[in-house]
UniProtKB/Swiss-Prot annotation:
The keyword ATP-binding does not apply. Belongs to the SNW family. Residues 313-349, 391-418 form a coiled coil. The keyword Zinc does not apply. Residues 240-251 have a biased composition (Pro residues). The gene is SKIPA. This is SNW/SKI-interacting protein A. It holds the Pfam family SKIP_SNW. Plants silencing SKIPA exhibit growth arrest and reduced cell viability. Plants overexpressing SKIPA exhibit drought resistance and significantly improved growth performance in medium containing stress agents (abscisic acid, salt, or mannitol). It comes from Oryza sativa subsp. japonica (Rice). PANTHER family: NUCLEAR PROTEIN SKIP-RELATED (PTHR12096). Residues 29-77, 178-205, 217-265, 327-434, 516-607 are annotated as: Disordered. Residues 327-339, 379-434, 516-527, 535-550, 562-571 have a biased composition (Basic and acidic residues). Residues 35-49 have a biased composition (Low complexity). Widely expressed.
Length: 607
């Protein structure tokens, strides 16, 4: 080890094991310096004794600070678990009523002697205790400027130098960071550190008691990308807020308390506290009367425009559908005439009739076909005017039955009017006071329901063969409803009419109620619009939907028409098309025309 110490350079700073703070300037100034130390050495018999140096960190096991000198120029020691009072902070005074004030200094470091007059009730007041407070402000400023001019200028220069140095440092760092070619120079001198390892046995560190390490700074690559992301530092707080000058406090009166009282919220849905709120307060809180409701005229214009547009669209759709139907009818007539002309031509060729004139084109021409159609139309009324004896007798019988039924209906209306005037229930009006459910159960709401005479009780309400107990319907009936609902027009007129004798004194007569309801235009605009009229009439019964029935699904009407016309085999010529060369093996031999399996052949007029 001796040879190694000789080789190593002399250390710059030797680390001491303890620090003696008694020779510091602050200790001499605070506790009297050398004279205080000599007095303390002379009075060694006193319990306080001289100031002891503070042991270094890690070796303060038996050190217990009791006096202010033991703390040095710092605070308490956290590793020593005893009650510590550095500079007397936190220590309770022995005398509770002590009037000794703590020594305070001002911003310049001078002792503030006016603290004596600024205690107690004067603590919150402004006390003028200086001579400068009595001198006018202008004279004070002039005297202070002349007296402190040199000192103030010196402070300005020092502050300027420090600010300049700080700004140059920041600017140089920014410039060096922006210019990577300027590699910052580092102190390449190595440092030697001697220390004692914690493990002092011969098995570790080759039995050495001390170790010396060499510490040097690691070289940095100037082209290496940055390892850390720069984050924005939040801006520091500026000047303190401006003090707000308040008026002197005053006691709160009862009126102020009432003015500050906020009433509870009035809700139309919730009332958790169970308050009883009058209706006038509730309406006032609603705010309905605060503003006047004004309806914009554009709403009426918009509804009128929509109504007119809808009517025009409906008219356009109807016109288009009408034109389309006319075009389809014309096209159908044209094709029928062409087929009829072709059939006539084929029939002429088959029978050997003379051919058509050369001036007429193939197919007979449109003019010839029209002439023949007119002749056939003229012959049909002549045949219809011929009436046989049996037909004439049947017609006379039908007229007689129709006249008898008309007289019977007039008689029933006269009887019903007479019974209504006498207050007697007629056959048609005796069931009007029944409930709707009873009418439905009795089958009175349908046209096919049986209607018997008036009895004490109606047997149709009991022992019905249709219901949930009897399977709800017959076995061969697939519909869940056995009969139509609301299909009788007389019954519908009574279902929607109020009862005759019910509450007539309160609501008026039934006819008056019905008339009032019928005249009520609830869903119509208040103002009429020009060019827009109600196309549909008033509805006096519910909406009914009829099942769409196919027209002649089995072709019976067409079959009967062909039988009545009495077609012959010769008339089939030309109806099967121009190509009929099958030898009986076609699948459509049973149909009219036979021949090819094609469903239709479109013929075009020759050009």
């Amino acid at each position: 080890m001796a040879s190694l110490k000789e080789l190593l350079p002399t250390p710059k700073a030797a680390a001491s094991t303890f620090y003696d703070h008694s020779s510091d300037p602050w200790f001499k100034e605070r506790y009297g310096g050398e004279s205080a130390q000599s007095d303390a050495a002379a009075a060694a018999a006193k319990p306080s004794g001289p100031a002891k140096p503070v042991p270094p960190y890690g070796k303060r096991g038996g050190f217990v600070p009791r006096r202010p000198e033991d703390f040095g120029d710092g605070g308490a020691f956290p590793e020593i678990h005893v009650a510590q009072y550095p500079l007397g902070m936190g220590r309770r005074d022995e005398k509770g009523g002590s009037k000794i004030l703590a020594l305070t200094v001002d911003a310049k470091g001078s002792v503030a002697f006016d603290a004596v007059v600024k205690q107690g009730e004067n603590a919150s007041k402004i006390v003028y205790s200086k001579h400068s407070d009595l001198v006018p402000k202008i004279a004070t400023a002039d005297s202070e400027a002349t007296a402190d001019d040199e000192e103030y200028q010196k402070q300005i220069e020092e502050t300027t130098e420090r600010t300049k140095a700080a700004l140059e440092k920041v600017v140089n760092v920014r410039l060096s960071a922006a210019q990577p070619k300027n590699v910052p120079t580092h102190d390449s001198e190595s440092k030697f550190i001697k220390y004692k390892p914690s493990q002092q046995s011969a098995a570790f560190n080759s039995g050495a008691k001390e170790r010396i390490i060499r510490m040097s700074e690691m070289a940095q690559d100037p082209l290496e990308p940055p390892k850390f992301k720069h984050k924005r530092v939040p801006r520091a707080s500026g000047s303190p807020p401006v003090p707000v000058m308040h008026s002197p406090p005053r006691p709160v009166t009862v009126k102020d308390q009432q003015d500050w009282k906020i009433p509870p919220c009035i809700s139309n849905w919730k009332n958790p506290k169970g308050y009883t709120i009058p209706l006038d307060k509730r309406l006032a809180a609603d705010g309905r009367g605060l503003q006047e409701v004004q309806i914009n005229d554009n709403f009426a214009k918009l509804s009128e425009a929509l109504y007119v547009a809808e009517q025009k669209a409906r008219e356009a759709v109807q016109m288009r559908s009408k034109v389309q139907r006319e075009l389809q009818l014309k096209e159908k007539e044209r094709k029928e005439q062409e087929l009829r002309a072709l059939a006539q031509k084929a029939r002429m060729e088959r029978t050997g009739a003379p051919p058509a004139p050369t001036g007429v084109p193939a197919g007979g021409g449109r003019g010839a076909v029209d002439d023949r159609e007119e002749d056939m139309d003229l012959e049909q009324p002549r045949e219809q005017r011929r009436e046989s004896r049996e037909e004439r007798e049947a017609r006379i019988e039908r007229d007689r039955i129709r006249e008898e039924r008309r007289r019977e209906r007039e008689r029933e209306r006269r009887l019903e009017a007479r019974d209504a005037a006498m207050g007697k229930k007629s056959k048609l009006t005796r069931d009007r006071d029944r409930d709707v459910s009873e009418k439905i159960a009795l089958g009175m709401a349908s046209t096919g329901g049986a209607k018997g005479g008036e009895v004490m009780y109606d047997q149709r309400l009991f022992n019905q063969d249709k219901g949930m107990d009897s399977g709800f319907a017959t076995d061969d009936q697939y519909n869940i409803y056995s009969k139509g609902l609301f299909t009788a027009q007389p019954t519908l007129s009574t279902l929607y009419r109020p009862k005759k004798d019910g509450d007539s004194d309160v609501y008026g007569d039934a006819d008056e109620q019905l008339e009032k309801v019928m005249k009520t235009d609830r869903f119509k605009p208040d103002k009429g619009f020009s060019g827009a009229s109600e196309r549909s009439g008033k509805r006096d019964r519910p909406v009914e939907f009829d099942k769409q029935e196919e027209n002649d699904p089995f072709g019976l009407d067409q079959f009967l028409t062909e039988v009545k016309k009495g077609k012959k085999a010769v008339e089939k010529i030309g109806s099967g098309g121009a190509m009929r060369a099958s030898g009986g093996s076609s699948m459509r031999d049973d149909y009219e025309g036979g021949g090819s399996g094609r469903s239709r052949i479109n013929f075009e007029r020759g050009r």
